[in-house]
């Protein structure tokens, strides 16, 4: 069983050792790591094959296997993400504001590291590298606890990172992997208030809920993606068809894939047959439709209440027909996970109302929800997509992994 106390102590000590690292040293190391990832591709693929074989033996679906799978191209993309983080401006030490107060005190507010970040995540091994690169660039140590399905991949990736750190003369304890997959150890990490400054969970609804219930350390919640697309009465239906197909079928296992379709009744009778025919030529989808939408499909099943709350991560989509923009907004706000939402419309005023009133971290007009991603938003590799409103919201890049500190300089000042 993992000794969480010892692991936490090492992480805390490492956070103090890497706190003074300069931007130049950090960037040089990240460039070295990016190259090492590509150079070690075959070793990483061999480790990933063990995870894939185990997953296949346990009957994991093809879509979930896709979340777990590493390929040469995906490793190359990981390396590019690391290099992009190296190329980004360093937020640490950035002066947010500076002024002299009425007493003559010189006051600066600067960005500083959080300290030790803990990350609990599922399936995707690339999270290990993405999370480490962002944490390291912001002078934070990180503790990683991945799912048991990706254990071999995560061990290989973290081993590579630690070896690269050691070769560069930097403490390898800047990254630690919790290899014990037990829930008991995960709960220990959630409650490690002496060592962990913030915990970021990244996974399905069950994981997020467990963290919310069990954690004693501060948490930045990265929610599930119950993502909707609303096709308005003034929508370009050809555009809507293209966007829905992309958002649902391109990669259904990711959190920015669309799960719910909301359609204005004025266009439902034209749009549903048009969409169904077009999507069947790409990838058939199981439609779970409400009473108004159901008769408009050639093939669909009646939706149950829970279908409108579900992140399917599969070729399944709920469908709701509404009579107004107001009803669409109300419906989405009732069922959203506050991740990403989209409207297809040619009416600028309708679009602005939707963007203002829908409660989500990212709200799109005439674009696929698949763009909600730190890399796409220019943040470099993301550590997660926050669906809460405090501290950080949306794709979390470098600034989300910093806090602030006030630096006050005086000359013998005392307060009378």
Swiss-Prot record:
Compartmental location: Cytoplasm
Gene Ontology BP terms: L-proline biosynthetic process
EC number: 1.2.1.41
Pathway: Amino-acid biosynthesis; L-proline biosynthesis; L-glutamate 5-semialdehyde from L-glutamate: step 2/2
GO molecular function: glutamate-5-semialdehyde dehydrogenase activity; NADP binding
Reactions performed catalytically: L-glutamate 5-semialdehyde + phosphate + NADP(+) = L-glutamyl 5-phosphate + NADPH + H(+)
Gene3D superfamilies: Aldehyde Dehydrogenase, Chain A, domain 1 (3.40.605.10), Aldehyde Dehydrogenase, Chain A, domain 2 (3.40.309.10)
Gene Ontology CC annotation, any one: cytoplasm
Pfam families from the UniProt entry: Aldedh
Root EC class: oxidoreductase
Record's keyword terms, sorted: Amino-acid biosynthesis, Cytoplasm, NADP, Oxidoreductase, Proline biosynthesis
Function: Catalyzes the NADPH-dependent reduction of L-glutamate 5-phosphate into L-glutamate 5-semialdehyde and phosphate. The product spontaneously undergoes cyclization to form 1-pyrroline-5-carboxylate.
Family note: Belongs to the gamma-glutamyl phosphate reductase family.
Protein name per the record: Gamma-glutamyl phosphate reductase
Organism: Streptococcus pyogenes serotype M49 (strain NZ131)
Organismal lineage: Bacteria, Bacillati, Bacillota, Bacilli, Lactobacillales
């Amino acid at each position: 069983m993992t000794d969480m106390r010892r692991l936490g102590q090492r992480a805390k000590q490492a956070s103090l050792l890497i706190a003074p690292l300069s931007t130049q040293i950090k960037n040089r190391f990240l460039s070295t790591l990016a190259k090492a990832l590509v150079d070690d591709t075959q070793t990483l693929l061999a480790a990933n094959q063990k995870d894939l074989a185990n997953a296949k033996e346990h009957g994991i679906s093809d879509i979930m296997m896709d979340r777990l799978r590493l390929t040469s191209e995906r490793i190359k993309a990981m390396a590019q993400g690391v290099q992009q983080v190296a190329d980004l401006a360093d937020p640490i030490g950035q002066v947010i504001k500076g002024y002299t107060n009425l007493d003559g005190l010189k006051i600066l507010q600067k960005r500083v590291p959080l300290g030790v970040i803990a990350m609990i995540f599922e399936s995707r091994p690339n999270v290990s590298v993405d999370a480490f690169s962002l944490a390291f660039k912001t002078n934070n140590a990180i503790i990683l606890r991945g799912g048991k399905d990706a254990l071999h991949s995560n061990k290989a990736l973290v081993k590579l990172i630690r070896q690269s750190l050691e070769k560069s003369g930097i403490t390898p304890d800047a990254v630690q992997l919790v290899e014990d997959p037990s829930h008991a150890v995960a709960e220990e990490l959630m409650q490690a208030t002496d060592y962990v400054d913030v915990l970021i969970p990244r996974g399905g609804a069950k994981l997020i809920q467990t963290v919310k219930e069990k954690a004693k350390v501060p948490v930045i919640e990265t929610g599930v993606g119950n993502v909707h697309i609303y096709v308005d009465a003034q929508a370009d239906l050809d555009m809507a068809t293209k966007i829905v197909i992309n958002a649902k079928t391109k990669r259904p296992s990711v959190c920015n894939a669309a799960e719910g379709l909301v359609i204005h009744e004025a266009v439902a009778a034209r749009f549903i047959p048009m969409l169904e025919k077009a999507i069947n030529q790409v990838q058939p989808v199981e439609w779970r439709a409400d009473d108004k939408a159901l008769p408009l499909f050639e093939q669909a099943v009646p939706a149950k209440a829970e279908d409108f709350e579900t992140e399917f991560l599969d070729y399944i989509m709920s469908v709701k027909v509404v009579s107004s923009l107001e009803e669409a907004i109300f419906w989405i706000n009732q069922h959203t996970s506050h991740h990403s939402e989209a409207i297809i419309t040619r009416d600028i005023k309708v679009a602005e109302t939707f963007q203002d009133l829908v409660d989500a971290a990212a709200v799109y007009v005439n674009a696929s929800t698949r763009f909600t991603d730190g890399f796409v938003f220019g943040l470099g590799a993301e550590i997660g997509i926050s669906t809460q409103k405090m501290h950080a919201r949306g794709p979390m890049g470098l600034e989300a992994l910093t806090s602030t500190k006030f630096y006050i300089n005086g000359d013998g000042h005392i307060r009378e």
